[in-house]
């Protein structure tokens, strides 16, 4: 039963249906951990014309979605974005100065440009630059989210923006697929597909669209995750009979087996940010729990003890691990600080929240939420903002993977 349980976790998705300092005198909106800096775009000229208006609308939405700012409609705020937006030849140009008027501090002074057909992309770039300059963390506006869509029994992988727009379909074969994950540079996507009738691992080059089968050992090939340096791939293989955790050198093809369990199985590997450890799921104690093991091998250390089942670990950029925990009959998203050994439950509604994936800002998490047998991808804010539905289309959407 142990193996059957963990194999369900491995391939169940196939059947799934449903830091910079801020001066003390800067005005803060709100209280507690989710306090926001007030920010205004009202001193940005050129936003009443067609492209400028579109730029303003997207930038305002991006900055609000970042969670760090309270965007005001009046001209004065703790952070003011000044400058102008204009069209020059075939390009849209945004000249931006981001300042704190109370102190005179200039966070950012830069000119950005993009083809006239890429105004949305330009706004995303500016938003990320503002977040990085003011808060010292990566922005998420330009990031992408891969996920699986299921319609009329056909499953494919798609990519969309962090705002749910610009949806692009990557696969068109309708074959059962699961576990999409990004390369560290964001130029390729790895996933498991039953395209040839067996669970094999594939790689899609996002520049050329070329698909390559890279792991097709006998039995299960699943849960691929690429190391931060891009040289190694952790995955689950059953080529020797039992689903075990392996690391494969992507250049030489050399395999290193990390686990050796007789009656249990391992799944869902996730690399630590420094590439030295791997989090994974094992049912060696009778129920699926999360463990950590050195990337070179050794004795695994159990990480989770609360919850009947703990699955789908995703190691975030700041060292915390998000996972799905079955508590009070439902799967909820939780976050554990590996060093402090503290555990925080992020969701609490009596619906299932599964398959968490960290955003590059270390604040937001994408997950699959299932309610009434219908699944959609939602974005959670670990600092308290309300969750937001990302997918607004028909069918089921799940297994999100946020780009680096």
Residue spans for each PLM region:
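A structural "domain/chain start" motif
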Residues: 22-61, 65
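Amphipathic beta-strand/beta-sheet edge segments enriched in Tyr/Trp
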Residues: 77-129
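Structural motif
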Residues: 91-93, 153-158, 198-202, 242-246, ...
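Residue-level detector of Asp-centered blade-edge/turn motifs that repeat once per structural unit
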Residues: 139-141, 184-185, 228-229, 273-274, ...
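Hydrophobic beta-strand positions that form the internal "hydrophobic ladder"
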Residues: 145, 189, 230-233, 275-279, ...
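Short loop/turn segments immediately following the C-termini of beta-strands
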Residues: 150, 194, 199, 238, ...
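Multi-bladed beta-propeller domains
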Residues: 161-178, 205-222, 248-266, 293-309, ...
